């Protein structure tokens, strides 16, 4: 699962565009696998960055917040990246359109992140852009919140899935076959044991 947040300004003080990739396990833990931040106004760069992350992690869904001009970018991504040469879906796009009833951006981030961090259900990798995310998480009013916002979008996605609990020796063979069928349908990530 991934989420993508768009920013249109190249100004140093403005937020950056961001992609966050997460994985999950059967205990409902969330693993931040990768983060990329960049500034651009070019639609082709949005596509290139997402294609690079998809190639690296092979996630099935990307959640994109769609407001104003972002709709055009998401449609471009759907046309260019979402299908292979045979027209089969390679990457599914979830359009997120926050409304008044969803609360402010800060309320949405708090609702998605605070309970999971309080329950110690979110794990970070070391180094790289994770330090930027961690700074945004601990500051009350960070100068930028693009990584935090994108992580909240991924975690609160309606497309986020958790794998089934591993089978024990006592459980019957039918449930083992069902687990094997489900496992084949999802991209496994060996380092963390969940799927993307």
Q: Where are the regions a protein language model picked out?
A:
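RNase H-like, metal-dependent nuclease domains and their acidic two-metal-ion catalytic environment used
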Residues: 1-94, 122-196
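Conserved phosphate-binding/catalytic loops in two-lobed NTP-binding clefts
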Residues: 85-109
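Sequence-pattern detector for short linear motifs
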Residues: 99-100, 108-111, 119, 184, ...
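Short, surface-exposed amphipathic charged segments that create phosphate/polyanion-binding patches used
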Residues: 105-119, 137-141
């Amino acid at each position: 699962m991934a989420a993508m947040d768009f920013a249109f300004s190249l100004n140093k003080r403005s937020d950056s565009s961001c992609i966050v990739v997460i994985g999950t396990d059967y205990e409902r833990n969330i693993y931040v696998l990768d983060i990329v931040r960049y500034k651009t106004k070019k639609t082709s760069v949005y596509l290139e960055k997402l294609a690079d992350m998809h190639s690296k992690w092979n996630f099935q869904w990307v959640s994109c917040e769609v407001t104003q001009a972002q709709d055009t970018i998401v449609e471009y991504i759907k046309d260019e990246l979402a299908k292979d040469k045979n027209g089969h879906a390679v990457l599914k796009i979830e359009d997120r359109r926050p409304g008044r009833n969803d609360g402010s951006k800060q309320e949405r981030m708090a609702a998605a992140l605070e309970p999971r961090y309080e329950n110690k259900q979110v794990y970070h990798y070391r180094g790289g852009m994770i330090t930027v995310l961690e700074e945004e998480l601990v500051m009350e009013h960070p100068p930028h919140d693009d990584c935090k916002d994108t992580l909240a979008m991924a975690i609160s996605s309606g497309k986020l899935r958790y794998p089934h609990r591993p089978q024990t020796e006592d459980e019957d063979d039918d449930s083992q076959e069902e687990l094997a069928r489900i496992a084949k349908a999802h991209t496994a990530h060996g380092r963390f044991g969940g799927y993307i």
